[in-house]
Each structure stands twice: as structure tokens, then as C-alpha cells.
Regions:
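Short, ordered, surface-exposed loop/turn motifs in non-cytosolic proteins
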Residues: 1-19
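Active-site recognition of the HExxH zinc-binding catalytic motif
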Residues: 159-176, 195-199, 203
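A short, solvent-exposed loop/turn motif at the edges and junctions
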Residues: 45-67
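Short Pro-Gly-centered beta-turn/loop motif in secreted/extracellular proteins
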Residues: 33-43
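Short, acidic Ser/Thr/Gly-rich low-complexity loop/linker segments typical of extracellular
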Residues: 16-33
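Auxiliary, metal-adjacent structural segments of Zn-dependent hydrolase domains
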Residues: 85-146
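Short pre-active-site segment immediately N-terminal to the catalytic Zn-binding motif
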Residues: 143-161
Length: 241
């Protein structure tokens, strides 16, 4: 978004040669420092999933992963452009911000791992969607890179992921948490309420991820997608309130 190289925290990295496997998660500097050592060239792979909270899929079914080289020594990967790997990384950043960092103290979406499907080539005319109830292989969240023939950037992918995770947070707070069970309140809620809340999540978290911008990062506001949450935050209220 601002041209800086950003370390990816909490990425699952695996290194293996034959039956020798080593695995760890990247630290605050984006480094996998606990992979052990190999006498022979080893294959690197990244699996875009969290142990506890989320699982990113390549399309509907396949695990999202990045295949690295077979080599000795240190593998340095810089993800740039609008590649498929960049899409996975963009969704990962959104998940990390919501589930682990959670600077605004909102309700974490879903008990157990949430499934987010990334569609790199498929175009169905929408940025993404969230399903409160899923069956079989159907995901909780779908995110699309192409929308009506237009290709969206990494930061737009992150913003969409935050929006859909905002819906998932809303669903859990109203329906899933102990003592809530107000499914009708969620199902029958006006679209303007649901979409404006998710827009507020986008606004707050995108500006937290990319601070010190000359102008605030704002999602498009139109019809049901209003800026009421931003307005309330400007009046001193917090997202949690």
C-alpha cells in the first residue's frame, strides 16, 4: 500500500528432505528461525493456515500454499505484485489482525478454525461473502481477486477479508457466544446495520495496519454500506462499544 516491505508474522513454514521435516511459524521480523539444519538440499513450503483460528484455501478445496525452492541455506522470500501468493498473504494479514492482534477488542469470529477460500481467477461479480452456517466443504468466507473483469490489488484483498471477518465477528457475537443465541436478531437485522458494521471494521483495521497515512483509508460508502461506524468513532466511541 505504501511501498514498504512488511514482515509477515505467524506464517507456517515447513522445510523437509526425504523423511526429515522441520516446521515453525515466523516471528515479528518475518523470520522462521527454528527450522533446524539439513545436510542435503531441503524443500521449503509455506502453508497459509493458523494452528487455531483460520485456514486459507486455494479455491474451494485445496490448501493454500507457496512452494519454495529446494536448496541449502536460507530462503529469503519477498512477495510482491498481485500474484496468487500475494493474495494469500493479504488474507493472512487480515486474519492475523483480527484474531491475534485484535487492537480494538472485538469478538473473535467463530469457535474453531474459520475457512477462507481465495479465488484468484474466478469472477462472480462480487468482492466476497460470508456464510453464517456452512455444510460440507462450503467455506465460511469467499474472497475474489477479479470482480466484473477488474483485478483488485493486495490492499483491496486485505480490506475485503477484514469486511467479511467483520460479518463473522458480528454473527458470533449475536448467535454463537454462550447466552446469545439470538439468530433471528442476526437474520432479520437490516442490511444497512450488517454492512455498515463490516465497513467500520474495514475502516478501523485498515488504518491500524497502515498508520500515518496523509489521508485516512476509507472503503467506499454507498447505499447500505454507510460510514456511520467511522462517524461514531470520530465522536469518541470505540468499536467494542
Amino acid at each position: 500500500f505504501n511501498g514498504q516491505t512488511i514482515p509477515l508474522v505467524g506464517v507456517r513454514v515447513r522445510c523437509h528432505h526425504l523423511l526429515h521435516f522441520e516446521e515453525c511459524f515466523t516471528n515479528a521480523n518475518g523470520e522462521a528461525t527454528s527450522l533446524g539444519s539439513f545436510k542435503q538440499p531441503a524443500r521449503y513450503k509455506i502453508f497459509w493456515e493458523d494452528q487455531k483460528y483460520w485456514d486459507i484455501r486455494d479455491g474451494l478445496t485445496w490448501q493454500a500454499k507457496t512452494k519454495g525452492p529446494r536448496m541449502t541455506g536460507r530462503w529469503e522470500l519477498v512477495i510482491s505484485g498481485d500474484t496468487e501468493d500475494a493474495m494469500f498473504a493479504a488474507i493472512h494479514r487480515a486474519c492475523r489482525a483480527i484474531f491475534h492482534d485484535n487492537p480494538f477488542g472485538i469478538t473473535r469470529p467463530k469457535r474453531g478454525r474459520i475457512k477462507l477460500c481465495a479465488f484468484y481467477k474466478k469472477d462472480v461479480g462480487k468482492n466476497g461473502d460470508h456464510a453464517g452456517i456452512t455444510v460440507g466443504i462450503w467455506p465460511d468466507i469467499r474472497i475474489f481477486r477479479k470482480v466484473k473483469g477488474n483485478t483488485r490489488s493486495r490492499w483491496e484483498i486485505t480490506s475485503t477479508a477484514l469486511h467479511e471477518l467483520g460479518h463473522a465477528s458480528h454473527h458470533r457475537a449475536v448467535v454463537e457466544l454462550p447466552g446469545s443465541n439470538r439468530i433471528e436478531d442476526f437474520v432479520l437485522a437490516d442490511g444497512i446495520l450488517k454492512e455498515s458494521w463490516a465497513r467500520g471494521i474495514q475502516f478501523a483495521f485498515m488504518n491500524w495496519l497502515y498508520p500515518n497515512q496523509v489521508n485516512k483509508i476509507r472503503p467506499d460508502y454507498f447505499e447500505n454500506y454507510t460510514g456511520v461506524v467511522e462517524g461514531l468513532m470520530n465522536q469518541g466511541l470505540t468499536l467494542k462499544q
